[in-house]
Design a protein with these regions (language model features):
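Residue-level recognition of tetratricopeptide repeat
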Residues: 3, 40, 77, 111-114, ...
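Alpha-helical adaptor scaffolds
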Residues: 6-11, 26-32, 36-104, 118
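Amphipathic alpha-helices of TPR/Sel1-like and other helical repeat/solenoid scaffolds
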Residues: 13-25
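Inward-facing hydrophobic residues that define packing positions of alpha-helical scaffold repeats
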Residues: 18, 55, 92-93, 126, ...
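Register position in tetratricopeptide repeats
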Residues: 44, 81, 115, 132, ...
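TPR/TPR-like (Sel1-like) alpha-helical repeat modules
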Residues: 117-138
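Extracytoplasmic/luminal low-complexity segments enriched in Pro/Gly and acidic/polar residues
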Residues: 139-167
């Protein structure tokens, strides 16, 4: 792939070839991967509208349930980057019943709430994500930074996760 942004012809060729792959192999996982590649390239170039379009294309290609969750959380992040907060949070609301995705969904919700300046709500979302990971005996060291950003100590983290409020 051409990553040199000065080489516009090569980038155009890559775009065309990846789109061709999507069109000709739509029923395969390769098409989903190709749409995700185009979405990443769009984000890298600052074109959030194109990234949103490609993420929606990836969803239309019927990826596996696990991949669909990742695509939806990426879509929520792209929408939030474009300050489309209600739409971003609505996507996460649609994933609320997916217990396997609960930690990721809660973390992304916290990130979006932080972008909106809603520190308390973000703290609750991060605490919910942390608690869901703890139930699985998994750790996410990045939460230490996120909790620090919202002013939570380890003891406060546990109490926020146990307060029974949904993020």
């Amino acid at each position: 792939l051409a990553v040199n942004t000065e080489d516009k012809a090569a980038n155009t060729d890559v775009q065309r070839l990846v789109q061709q792959l999507i069109n000709e192999y739509a029923s395969t996982p390769y098409a989903v991967d190709a749409a995700l590649l185009l979405a990443k390239r769009a984000v890298d170039s600052g074109d959030l509208a194109a990234a949103e379009k490609q993420l929606r294309v990836a969803l239309e290609l019927k990826p596996s349930a696990e991949i669909a969750v990742l695509i939806q959380t990426r879509l929520a992040r792209v929408l939030a980057a474009g300050k489309q907060y209600p739409a971003a949070l609505a996507i996460l609301d649609d994933l609320a019943g997916d217990t396997a995705a609960a930690p990721l969904v809660a973390e992304v919700r916290g990130d979006i709430l932080m972008l909106q300046g809603q520190r308390d709500a973000a703290a609750k979302a991060y605490a919910a994500a942390d608690a869901a990971l703890a139930e699985r005996d998994e750790a996410r060291p990045v939460f230490d930074l996120k909790f620090s950003d919202v002013g939570l100590t380890p003891a406060k983290r546990a109490s926020d996760a146990d307060d029974g409020e949904a993020p």
